[in-house]
Amino acid sequence: MRKLTFIVLLSLFCLMGRAVHAQQVDFAVGLSGVHSTSAADASGNFFPQDVGGGVFPTFSGDFLLFKHFGVGGEVSWRATRNLSNGFAPFRPIFYDFNAVYAPPLGKRAALELLGGFGGESIRFYQNFVTCGAFSCSNFVSSNHLLGDVGVGLKLYPFNNIFIRPEMRVYFIRNNFEFSDNHAERLGVSIGYTFGR
């Protein structure tokens, strides 16, 4: 009985190793810009302030579980503060979790289509510090649920290193602090693929 158990466990371990070998993991870092409706074009339901402008560093990763399908996530934030109404400093942060479809386009390229949900966290900075039970901060946050869709093109100039031009469209719920309820992010990321 012990011999049979050992053989079954060894077989499962070997099969698991083969399945793990077929998986792919990508990590990337990039820079992008965010664009949305300008403050001058804000409708009556939205505050006349643009969420875009400035440079947005981005960190992202994905894990392809089955052939070209997987999951991923990313976070982007404005590198410097912007001013709301010319006097109140703020910084938007976008984060999302996505379903990913990444079919290869030959040996040196892959398409990346994604869609999912996440959030927009807007930090409004103050000139004073507010303390709670465990920590202190100099900002208050306004958080909003968002849905996103995106596309990217991974180009592999060297083995597993890729350059990815990318676009994301965010549909932000109750984004009343800004001039519209959607924003577009355009950027370029450099990354590495494990398991390609």
Each PLM stretch: what is its role?
Residues 34-57, 142-143:
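Surface-exposed strand-loop-strand hairpins of Gram-negative outer-membrane beta-barrel proteins
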Residues 7-15:
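Bacterial N-terminal signal peptides
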Residues 1-7:
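Bacterial N-terminal signal peptides that target proteins for export
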Residues 43-47, 82-88, 133-139, 173-178:
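Extracellular loop and loop/strand-boundary signature of outer-membrane beta-barrel proteins
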Residues 6, 177-188:
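Short glycine/proline-enriched turn or capping motifs at secondary-structure junctions
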Residues 16-22:
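Sec/Tat signal peptide C-region and signal peptidase I cleavage site
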Residues 24, 31-33, 55-134, 144-147, ...:
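Gram-negative (and chloroplast) outer-membrane scaffold detector with strong preference
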